[in-house]
Design a protein with these regions (language model features):
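Solvent-exposed alpha-helices and their adjacent loops that cap or buttress functional pockets
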Residues: 34-36, 87-89, 95-96, 119-122, ...
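Conserved donor-nucleotide/metal-binding helix-loop-beta segment in metal-dependent transferases, i.e.
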Residues: 102-137, 144
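Conserved beta-strand scaffold positions in the cores of enzyme catalytic domains, especially
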Residues: 65, 126-128, 250
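Conserved N-terminal catalytic core of the sugar/cofactor nucleotidyltransferase
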Residues: 2-5, 9, 17-98, 102-114
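Short beta-strand segments
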Residues: 44, 95-98, 128-132, 163, ...
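Catalytic core of tubulin tyrosine ligase-like
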Residues: 142-255
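Structural signal for hydrophobic packing residues in well-ordered secondary-structure cores
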Residues: 29, 33-36, 57, 89, ...
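A short acidic, often aromatic-flanked loop/helix-cap motif at beta-alpha or helix-coil junctions
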Residues: 71-76, 135-137, 168-170
Length: 255
């Protein structure tokens, strides 16, 4: 870890006060409170860290902590969150925001997310937030967008391809082309739509999520979750869904 020895398994960087008096996850929470009501903010977390995070952000209702039995990468985690959100509101728009991002300019963030929400209201699509690159970074994945396919909503473009973390020479070519954005791992879509995409492209994960969904709100939930989670294969949302789906768009951000 870049923050070792401060950042360890029991105290990940999300719980470090790297930028002042507040932890990274508290800063993320503060940012989200500008765009969402308190009861609509969820935390996907391991059981080991849930108490630490709840102590740091006691405002978030305990029932909004979605516990992952074990880490299985982003696709299963997002699918599990989508289940809980869809159960509460079948028409809900959900955003996915890592808790360890440094974002300067909360008003810019709010505007970008508002535009992304407009887009997913207009058509059934998946939105990924792309950061305009300032140097040829090799530590990020990249999104290639089609500048000729600009949507009616400000800053939204059709995605051409996703690229894994490149070598420096490739990253330099990406920057020169002007067609690539950093993949920030932030997404906006309707819960229903991402669950449909999981059904299309990740049928085994969908089957497990289906069983978990049926157990939501029952005494059997934790037993079913643990059983099905054992069957789930680790996979990123990028590889599992976004690189395969046809209805993927990006919105350019400069925060």
């Amino acid at each position: 870890s870049r923050f070792w020895p401060k950042s360890r398994e029991n105290t990940p960087k999300q719980l470090l006060k790297i930028l002042g008096k507040e932890t990274m996850i508290r800063l993320t929470y503060n940012r989200l409170r500008e765009i969402a009501d308190l009861d609509k903010i969820f935390v996907v977390v391991s059981a080991k860290l849930s108490k630490l995070i709840h102590n740091d952000i006691p405002e978030i209702p305990e029932e909004n902590f979605i516990i992952e039995p074990s880490g299985k990468n982003t696709a299963p985690a997002i699918g599990l969150a989508a289940l809980h959100i869809f159960k509460r509101d079948s028409n809900a728009i959900m955003g996915v925001y890592p808790a360890d991002h440094l974002i300067i300019g909360d008003s810019k963030f709010k505007n970008i997310i508002t535009n992304a929400q407009k887009m997913v209201e207009q058509k059934p699509c998946l939105i990924t937030i792309g950061i305009e690159p300032t140097y040829p970074a090799t530590g990020y994945g990249y999104i290639q967008y089609d500048s000729n396919k600009k949507m009616d909503v400000k800053g939204v473009y059709k995605v051409k391809t996703f690229a894994e973390k490149p070598e420096k020479e490739t990253a330099e070519k990406f920057i020169i082309s002007g067609e690539f954005l950093w993949n920030a791992g932030m997404f906006v879509w309707k819960a229903e739509i991402i669950l449909l995409e999981i059904k299309t492209f990740m049928c085994e994960l969908h089957d497990s999520l289906d069983s978990i969904y049926d157990a939501l709100g029952t005494p059997q939930y934790e037993t079913v979750l643990d059983r099905e989670w054992e069957l789930v294969h680790p996979e990123s949302i990028d590889y599992g869904i976004l690189e395969k789906a046809k209805n993927v768009y990006t919105i350019k951000a400069d925060f």
